[in-house]
Structures are given as C-alpha cells and as structure tokens.
Amino acid sequence: MVKTQRVVITPGEPAGIGPDLVVQLAQREWPVELVVCADATLLTDRAAMLGLPLTLRPYSPNSPAQPQTTGTLTLLPVALRESVTAGQLAIENGHYVVETLARACDGCLNGEFAALITGPVHKGVINDAGIPFTGHTEFFEERSQAKKVVMMLATEELRVALATTHLPLRDIADAITPALLHEVIAILHHDLRTKFGIAEPRILVCGLNPHAGEGGHMGTEEIDTIIPVLDELRAQGMKLNGPLPADTLFQPKYLDNADAVLAMYHDQGLPVLKYQGFGRGVNITLGLPFIRTSVDHGTALELAGRGEADVGSFITALNLAIKMIVNTQ
C-alpha cells in the first residue's frame, strides 16, 4: 500500500480570496492529508460567510497521515496579528503571512510535508509591514538556502520557465550571463526529469531580442551568450531548440515537439501562458529541495467572502503537486 502523504497549504493574504479557496478545497475528498497553516478563526469565519461546512482537526505530526475527507481540514495554527475583515488589508497581518510561509517551508525542509501549495499574497502589505518581500519564489530560495531556483508556470498544454523573474526591463540584458543560463537550464532539465517524469526533456529557448537578434543586427546577446551556452549543453546530451524568436515560438509547429519553454524574462513568456490558460495555471518553483506549487492569480480582495472566487487554479496546483509527489517516490 502506498503511504499517504501530507501536503501543507498557506492561504496567503487573509483579507483576500485565499481562505475562501482553501475552504472550497475542503469540499471534496483528497488522497493526501491537507495541512493548512493558518488562523483557525479566519477559516471558520470564512466558511460561515460562504455557507460551507468545515471541521478543523488538529495537526498531529506523530500520527500517520490520513486522506482528507469532505468538509475537513487539518490545522497547523498560526495566529493572526489583527482581526480580519474580508476585502480590507491590515498591515500587521503582513507578519502573519510571512510566519505561515516560514512554518510551511520549514516543515517541508524537515520532512513533515511532501509538498507546499501557496495561495496568493499581497506583496505591498508585507513590505508596508517592514518586511522586505519580493515574492514567494525568492522567499523560499533564501529560507531553504537553495543555490538557485527557477520560476515556471504551467497549464495542461504548456510549461514556461523564466531565466529571470522580477527584474526591471533595463536590467535584464546584463542579467543574462552564461553562468545564469547554465544554472537555469540545468535546473529546468533536472526537475522535468525528476519531478515531472520526463525521461529526455525537450526544451525550446527564446532569444532575448526581437527576431532572436536578427543575426546580430538587433542585439548580440544571442550570438555572444545564448548560442554558446546551448551548444555546450547540447554536447552534453540535452535536447534544446533555440534561440528562437519569441513572437513565433509559441505555435504548434514548435510546441508540439517540446516539453517546456525557457523565456528570458517575465513578460516575454507569461502573457502567452496566461492568455491561453488563465485560472487553470500553476506556478512551480524548480530547484527547491521540496515540491512547491501555487495559484497563478492574485488576492482579489473585492471577491473575498462573497462566494464568487474560482477555485480552479488551486485545484490544479494541488493535483499537480500530488502528481509530482508520485513521480519522486
């Protein structure tokens, strides 16, 4: 019999739709135990607002994990700093959000949990609370002391990884170095094999410049940096196609023969993916010593507590994490 695994969930910003979505997740059975790192009253109040049943059972790390039954969640309690009104940010709760992320991350690092699924956070309120915070990806990279992580978003049809993440456009060309590309492609290739079960990953690589530099007439980063790195990695046996112009890469001619796309920067690759599958996408952090997936949307403060939030991305993120757990066993 396969051992039941525990996954930990952080609902994210307490005034947003994250708690709503977690309550909605509880309305179905799951083959894993869902441990929610959150304030108990927050969850029960939000369930009452949505008119949905919810029973919280205490987290017992020394007991065997049990598949989650309908209407229940396992609670790993973290107390709010301020009471919550749905849709209204409270600066002190920025500390609460970071505490949930830290506890969940530490639990993955010490083997308590097989995966971490994160709800949407509000970066502004965390920074307003005096906590420098760029995003989940960078937070988990630092806390886990990972050498390097890679952000990848995925739908059922498309996976897009990023060579750089949250950088201003003016800084991107300088950031695309041979060392960076070697690291990013190695991590992407490794995790596609180990976490996604793809024996020989096929990766499409975007150029940085329009028309992938047009032979050096629209920038030389392809000639100076990207092509030499790809040639070296191909010589090691990796299946890499590129650099290709980003404006023509995202079509069936190329995508039908690829397992993932590597974009050079955030807004090069993600608009295509989000247009194609918004609400069904999943954010995955590659390179961490544990599995981490996330929703692909924001806090939607205006929908909190109204019963109008779509749980689809959270369900997809959880299902993908479960598949990744199976692939790594």
From Swiss-Prot:
Its main location: cytoplasm. It catalyses: 4-(phosphooxy)-L-threonine + NAD(+) = 3-amino-2-oxopropyl phosphate + CO2 + NADH. GO terms for cellular component: cytoplasm. GO terms for biological process: pyridoxal phosphate biosynthetic process; pyridoxine biosynthetic process. Binds 1 divalent metal cation per subunit. Can use ions such as Zn(2+), Mg(2+) or Co(2+). It is an enzyme of class 1 (oxidoreductase). It is found in: Cytoplasm. The keyword Zinc applies. Pfam families: PdxA (PF04166). A divalent metal cation binds at residues 166, 211, 266. Its cofactor is Zn(2+); Mg(2+); Co(2+). Pathway: Cofactor biosynthesis; pyridoxine 5'-phosphate biosynthesis; pyridoxine 5'-phosphate from D-erythrose 4-phosphate: step 4/5. Its EC number is 1.1.1.262. One of its GO terms (molecular function) is zinc ion binding. Substrate binds at residues 136-137, 274, 283, 292. Keywords: Cobalt, Cytoplasm, Magnesium, Metal-binding, NAD, NADP, Oxidoreductase, Pyridoxine biosynthesis, Zinc. Homodimer. Catalyzes the NAD(P)-dependent oxidation of 4-(phosphooxy)-L-threonine (HTP) into 2-amino-3-oxo-4-(phosphooxy)butyric acid which spontaneously decarboxylates to form 3-amino-2-oxopropyl phosphate (AHAP). The active site is located at the dimer interface. Belongs to the PdxA family. This is 4-hydroxythreonine-4-phosphate dehydrogenase. It comes from Escherichia coli O139:H28 (strain E24377A / ETEC).
